[in-house]
């Protein structure tokens, strides 16, 4: 389980900051009940806490992590375009993610609960434009984003679904 107090890897500790081209990445953990969820905010280069920004929450596919989403440069590019982005590791969503829960204990429904918990935390930030909260989901993260948005219609402005695994719902 992820330990928020101490880590062998300082790069996953709360508040760890990385300057990237045109944006800043900051580690920010949140919780779903007793489970710790590892995540990162990406802020535009000219970020100002007193302003509001459209926000994209990015959800990875099964067996993947937020680092895989990062490698595609999606969070970085969106932040460079003026969005605040939050990426995270689903609890149990991967064998090598940083969040709590064993891979064998993860389901689409537990991931839906994780995404909803992430949304709740993100929405508390003063700089979030509440009318412009977007969900981006890849593969199973696309299915989870669609299911979550269906339950939280008033909270989601739009979705970006990249090869969503809708077939899972049929199985």
Residue positions per predicted region:
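N-terminal cap/lid segment of alpha/beta-hydrolase-fold proteins
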Residues: 6-50
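Short beta-strand element of the alpha/beta-hydrolase
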Residues: 51-61
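The serine-hydrolase catalytic nucleophile loop
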Residues: 64-75
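Conserved alpha/beta-hydrolase
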Residues: 79-98
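Alpha/beta-hydrolase active-site loop
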Residues: 104-126
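Alpha/beta-hydrolase fold nucleophile elbow
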Residues: 127-139
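Glycine-rich nucleophile elbow surrounding the catalytic serine of serine-hydrolase chemistry
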Residues: 137-147
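Hydrolase active-site cap/lid region
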Residues: 150-171
């Amino acid at each position: 389980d992820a330990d928020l107090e101490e880590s062998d890897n300082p790069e996953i500790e709360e508040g760890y900051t990385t300057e990237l081209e045109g944006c800043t990445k900051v580690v920010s953990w949140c919780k779903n009940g007793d489970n710790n969820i590892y995540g990162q905010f990406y802020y535009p280069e000219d970020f100002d806490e007193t302003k509001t920004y459209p926000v994209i929450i990015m959800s990875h596919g099964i067996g993947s992590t937020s680092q895989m989403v990062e490698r595609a440069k999606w969070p970085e590019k969106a932040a460079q375009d003026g969005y605040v982005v939050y990426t995270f590791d689903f609890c149990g969503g991967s064998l090598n993610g940083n969040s709590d829960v064993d891979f064998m204990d993860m389901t689409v429904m537990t991931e839906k609960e994780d995404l909803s918990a992430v949304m709740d935390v993100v929405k508390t930030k003063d700089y979030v434009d509440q009318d412009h909260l977007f969900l981006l989901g890849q593969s199973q993260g696309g299915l989870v984003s669609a299911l979550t948005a269906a339950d939280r219609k008033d909270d989601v402005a739009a979705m970006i679904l990249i090869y969503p695994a809708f077939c899972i719902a049929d199985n």
